[in-house]
């Protein structure tokens, strides 16, 4: 329901960081488009954290992100209900990660990022799909 402009390839290699000035820029906009911002977040975390850290730091990383997102929405888009956006994107995180796994499975089926954490999130999504199918 809540969409934004997404980068589409938000891996760590596409970020330029000036730590001294606390500035960040992104490059390589070949996949830019409209979508759910949590897609970029999931892809960024997959490239910035090791597989083990994805599992152990997920809650912390997402908490930092969603706190900043909520503040940014309230400042720049005050007519939006920031809580609704955050709640929707929180629910969609596992879907975004499962989509990343789908991409990896087609591109590099033995990629090291197709690990226990990635497979667990994908299984969670598959269970949600089965549950929805039974409700139809």
Where does each model-flagged region fall?
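Conserved catalytic-loop position in the HRD/HxD motif
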Residues: 9, 28
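All-alpha amphipathic helical-bundle segments outside canonical DNA-binding/catalytic cores
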Residues: 77-96
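Activation segment
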Residues: 13, 18, 24, 32-34
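Hydrophobic "anchor" residues on beta-strands that sit immediately upstream
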Residues: 3-5, 24, 36
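ATP/Mg2+ or Mg2+-diphosphate-binding catalytic cores
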Residues: 90-136
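ATP-dependent phospho-/nucleotidyl transfer catalytic cores
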Residues: 1-7, 16-19, 127
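Active-site activation/catalytic loop segments of kinase-like enzymes and analogous catalytic loops
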Residues: 31-76, 97-115
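Short, glycine- and charge-enriched coil/turn segments that flank and shape catalytic ligand pockets
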Residues: 18-23, 75-83
């Amino acid at each position: 329901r809540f969409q934004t402009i997404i980068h589409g390839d938000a891996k760590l290699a596409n970020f330029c960081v000036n730590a001294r000035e606390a500035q960040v820029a992104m490059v390589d906009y070949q996949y830019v488009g409209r979508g759910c911002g949590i897609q970029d977040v999931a892809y960024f975390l997959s490239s910035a954290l090791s597989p083990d850290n994805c599992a152990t730091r997920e809650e912390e990383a997402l908490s930092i992100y969603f706190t900043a997102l909520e503040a940014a929405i309230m400042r720049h888009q005050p007519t939006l209900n920031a809580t609704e956006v955050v709640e929707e994107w929180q629910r969609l995180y596992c879907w975004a990660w499962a989509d990343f796994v789908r991409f990896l499975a087609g591109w590099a089926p033995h990629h090291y990022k197709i690990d226990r954490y990635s497979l667990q999130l994908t299984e969670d999504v598959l269970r949600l799909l089965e549950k929805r199918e039974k409700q139809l």
